[in-house]
Amino acid sequence: MDLVRFGIIGTAAIAVEKVIPSMLSAEGLEVVAIASRDLDRARAAATRFGIGRSYGSYDEILADPEIEAVYIPLPNHLHVHWAIRAAEAGKHVLCEKPLALDVEELSRLIDCRDRTGRRIQEAVMIRAHPQWDEIFDIVASGEIGEVRAIQGVFTEVNLDPKSIVNDASIGGGALYDLGVYPIAAARMVFAAEPERVFAVSDLDPVFGIDRLTSAVLLFPGGRQATLVVSTQLALRHNVEIFGTRKSISLKNPFNPTPDDHCRIVLDNGSKLAAAAAETRRVAPADQYRLQAERFSAAIRSGSPLPIELEWSLGTMKVLNAIQRSAERGNWETV
């Protein structure tokens, strides 16, 4: 199978620290070019990773006829603009999350996909990690009974005034930077969409972003998911899944490193003691590499993408409803 030739649009930290190194070790693709608005930054990244070509503008990399697909790690407010530009230039697109800032933006991207015939995917890398396949198998087996509640927590500390996460004007804040993860976890495990949400946010008085957002998501049949995301609380990543017979705790659900043995802890609820728990380990995996490989394989085979834009549209509807609820103080329909 011919390798899918990728260009990287931007030199964001997530690209240079996580995604590019993983893509370089992936099968079925090669990274042939990288672009930045600062040519020196592009050249430095190209030298660091042994990438053949570097460009000082995004337009230049889109004009490169050898590039078939692009990875976009730009700030949130630029995702849709450059994804559309890339698709119109004939490139397939793997774009960081959140894919858009609102439903209208994402609908325009879906229209662009349908018009151009290019493949466009949101980079929700957790879906590629095998620990989630193990979770789905456990839930489907009925071992934990009927799943009625899910809790997701993603907190970290980022007080950098230069960070895009702390710029409200470009889609920063805890909800848009971190909320995608626990929302994805709940939607994947329930295999359903929430109907209503209620949320509260605490705004940073200097940055103007939501530094803490909590939300309740009501799913069909009375099932519930709760989430807490923050950019100014001590680091914690956790997902709890509650069934009528057992509960599941994922100890590193979102950002396991390629050498992490992920732990899935099942508790039968018979007593509040460690003896009631069973730990299952999932072999280490590089979720960024797997994400890139599966995206590339879908391009070559013409098979469905691991995550289609319609699924991302569902995420966007939830994010927007949470934001409305936090602003208005009301339950909001998704």
Swiss-Prot record:
The keyword Oxidoreductase applies. Belongs to the Gfo/Idh/MocA family. It is an enzyme of class 1 (oxidoreductase). GO terms for molecular function: nucleotide binding; oxidoreductase activity. PANTHER family: OXIDOREDUCTASES (PTHR22604), TRANS-1,2-DIHYDROBENZENE-1,2-DIOL DEHYDROGENASE (PTHR22604:SF105). Its EC number is 1.-.-.-. Coiled coil: none annotated. This is Uncharacterized oxidoreductase ORF334.
